[in-house]
């Protein structure tokens, strides 16, 4: 066993007892020293994944490659173990980086793709997770863990049919596995809901019936099954299922409205009226209609904030009775509250087509576009609203707010905003518009007050949270800007633009370790892994020399003749206490690609650090012969002479 193999086994043992910090330190030292790289045979050994909860000391057959031409052996499994250790530490972006490197080095090993997919899934990047896990299953079809995780990745990517097929195939191999069966039933449920929404009511009925028979029971399965029966006009069966749903949630009044609607469909008006009276709704028999009752169910769900059920009920109404302004407005509101902006806009537009002069769809559309900050579209919507006869003051209000967010001169917009404020307007939309206008005028101190007013009304207002960042940066208040960036990204973690701004801020304020972490997080969401030199530089500036050296080595594999990368790698090795290794690497690179004054100077420094005083003197003299007057070389040479004389 080589010393490298012994060190790897030591790291594996540390990982097996959850001493991940020690395992990472050992593995990063090996990777930084180049032990993970080298010439490896394409059919080199593989590490086989044995499940997501596999212990470190299982399945650890080594995948190092032996250099048949006398080159140093490579141990790419170092990257795999690093990926697993960082995943265990919940540092998923770094886990992705190392798993990516390993999978490129050993592409036939399903374990690498498995752990890459697992870390992508932890970062909520379902598409990348699916691609990695599909490759894992292809390389190792017998892997139960990879198949289960692939099914989950498909589910999270909103592809229930693909998920169900994966679980079905896995169950054919492992029919008694409870995890696979649970995944299969979950994916079948989501697929059944999709079939119902697309109009395949009979297929949905069969699927929901199967699920209930498999003990996947409760309000949701019964409610969806009832909707399926209703779409098929099987009203008695639908009534039975609505009552079954109510039995699971007896205090949910919305479910009673469905029962009443079915009683009306079946001609039982007296029973429907009696049921409604228990809900506090007094209505004559001849005034009861199924339309009224389904609409009532939609409204009840909305009152309770049950947006998914409200959307389902509204969809049922639309399929049964066709479109109307009222139902499209309700559906738009449901989808707007659920964050599905484009679907909401579609329903507002459909309502406008039914009644072009009805102002309510125009107001709803303007609110939706404003919340989504789609200002160019809002400007056009305002003109349409004016043409439909909407209130002139309301249109003026939206026009001024929109102007503040477009490329209009802020000094021209400000008087209109001030007029609105004097007129009694006191809402967060106006406050934010005043904030952005003052920022553009260079009056961040005034802007700050308006954003703070907004946040008193709504602490979750995203525009105001971003506005505070801009104000603090303009006022050079780095401490508050730093805090606000952190607060914002903890709430809206997917905003890549703000994260890039935060990285620039962290670099400017020399918070290098945190800058590197955020660079890594951004890189995990893009094909290509590391952000190259920027990440390596941040790690180096943070004093994280092992991690920086690993990245510089990866970059040098792509650009082996680039001097800056070489010099930075050697610098990191020196800081790690591996000046000897750095010196050997530098000399080898100079022999291969030629030397330079800077390289010779660094060689002189390394000779001094390794106590090769005579070699340092020769090297530094050569530098001064090539470039007389080089101050750094002169100072180092004087130091070398002093060391030589002290030894004499």
UniProtKB/Swiss-Prot annotation:
InterPro entries: CellSynth/LPSAsmb/PSIAsmb, TPR-like_helical_dom_sf, TPR_rpt. TPR repeats lie at residues 1-30, 76-109, 110-143, 144-177, 219-252, 325-358, 428-461, 527-562, 597-630. Pfam families: TPR_6. Keywords: Repeat, TPR repeat. SUPFAM superfamilies: TPR-like. PROSITE patterns: TPR, TPR_REGION. PANTHER family: LIPOPOLYSACCHARIDE ASSEMBLY PROTEIN B (PTHR45586:SF1), TPR REPEAT-CONTAINING PROTEIN PA4667 (PTHR45586). This is TPR repeat-containing protein TP_0095.
